[in-house]
Amino acid sequence: MEKSWFNLMFSKGELEYRGELSKAMDSFAPIEKTTISKDRFIYDMDKNFYGWGERSSYYNNVDLLVNSKDIRNFISDDTFFVRDSNKNSYSIYFDIEKKKFEINNDLSDLEIFFYSYCSSSYLNNRSKGDNDLHYDPYIKDTKYNCNNHINSCIDSYFRSHICINSHFLSDSNNSNESYIYNFICSESGSGKIRESKNDKIRTNSNRNNLMSSKDFDITKNYNQLWIQCDNCYGLKYKKVEMNVCEECGHYLKMTSSERIELLIDPGSWNGMDEDMVSADPIKFHSREEPYKKRIASAQKKTGLTDAIQTGTGQLNGIPVALGVMDFQFMGGSMGSVVGDKITRLIEYATNQCLPLILVCSSGGARMQEGSLSLMQMAKISSVLCDYQSSKKLFYISILTSPTTGGVTASLGMLGDIIIAEPYAYIAFAGKRVIEQTLKKAVPEGSQAAESLLRKGLLDAIVPRNPLKGVVSELFQLHAFFPLNKNEIK
């Protein structure tokens, strides 16, 4: 990844902080080993200088001289003086309380102050022969040229340190990467937007167009086209990327409909038992929300009747029986309806001699149905035994993140071939449950797909792009061929 740099000077009364931010700093945790730039310095008004030697190398996550927990007090109402790597200078002002954010090149007052201060203090302590990429003997006024690079750097800084949510629109060529948010979360972290007359953002070039930040709420208005990575917060076009972040490689959750579209040939899907709806068999009582209301809310949110879609279709021309769990429906929990739909699908595949695919994405048994949900584990295991042992048919289990609890203990680990997605979280008991029960820390990554593969619990880890082709080859290897020979891929 190409890294660009800019200098940022904070004017804050007694101290001047000068640091450098990388274009790639998106989170608190380091992406790789960090090497600190060695020409950092703090220079106070009493001429106390703390310095290091020559620069060693770039780094790709934030390393500020200001403690992040004190960042609110530090920048509560301040003007920033910014100089990019092209030695262009800008004035950046924002006020947390008033939700005001402005970038302009009116540097008359700031230039006088900084030029005077730098001439008397900073330049006297730096030799002009130093090989500093960002050394500048003067700070000059320039035309306003706030490019996509500086927007991205400031955006990453704000996003990772002060939880900002609305977007700043750049006039650069790649504007969808230069969103700078215009409001800052409250101290409680709730992120609630506070309306104010200053909830406007000024555009880059001519500063004549004032637009409300609400017009650019991309995740709400265009969520059918774009998806935001919950690891690096980048926006991705979901149809092309298959919900895989190309920046950090993070695998985002997919709905059951998206997985059906990924695996099944267009126009060949036929759903089964779509009218089955969960009841409240044990009259589960909850102070927060009754079980029936939770079911209705999940149905409205997902458009599904329960946490799984089952049916038949063709995979590269090969007839298959497919069941796909949906984590968005009450965490993909397995209740009586989910168990019945899976059981009926397996029985249908047994009678029709179809290969079977079950895609797991679940938190386990549904506690609102008590022991009835636990019964589904035994019921599914029983029909799978008949399908595999008696009929000698072929079952592929695909484990996605997360797959835990009763689903892991039953249908998840009973496949003839067990495939997992990269980085999938797969476990019987969750990390928190183990730590609270055993009073021991669970090693990081011990419940990830890669760790389970090394221990022999999985047969393969397959990314989403080649998944359909891999499954098709496995079916043909086990004598399941396309109805039309021309459809072999």
From Swiss-Prot:
It is found in: Plastid, Chloroplast stroma. The keyword Chloroplast applies. Its main location: plastid. GO terms for cellular component: acetyl-CoA carboxylase complex; chloroplast stroma. Residues 225-489 form the CoA carboxyltransferase N-terminal domain. It holds the Pfam family Carboxyl_trans. Keywords: ATP-binding, Chloroplast, Fatty acid biosynthesis, Fatty acid metabolism, Lipid biosynthesis, Lipid metabolism, Metal-binding, Nucleotide-binding, Plastid, Transferase, Zinc, Zinc-finger. It comes from the Eukaryota. GO terms for molecular function: acetyl-CoA carboxylase activity; ATP binding; carboxyl- or carbamoyltransferase activity; zinc ion binding. Binds 1 zinc ion per subunit. It catalyses: N(6)-carboxybiotinyl-L-lysyl-[protein] + acetyl-CoA = N(6)-biotinyl-L-lysyl-[protein] + malonyl-CoA. Its EC number is 2.1.3.15. A zinc finger (C4-type) spans 229-248. PROSITE patterns: COA_CT_NTER (PS50980). Belongs to the AccD/PCCB family. PANTHER family: ACETYL-COENZYME A CARBOXYLASE CARBOXYL TRANSFERASE SUBUNIT BETA, CHLOROPLASTIC. Acetyl-CoA carboxylase is a heterohexamer composed of biotin carboxyl carrier protein, biotin carboxylase and 2 subunits each of ACCase subunit alpha and ACCase plastid-coded subunit beta (accD). This is Acetyl-coenzyme A carboxylase carboxyl transferase subunit beta, chloroplastic. It comes from Brassica napus (Rape).
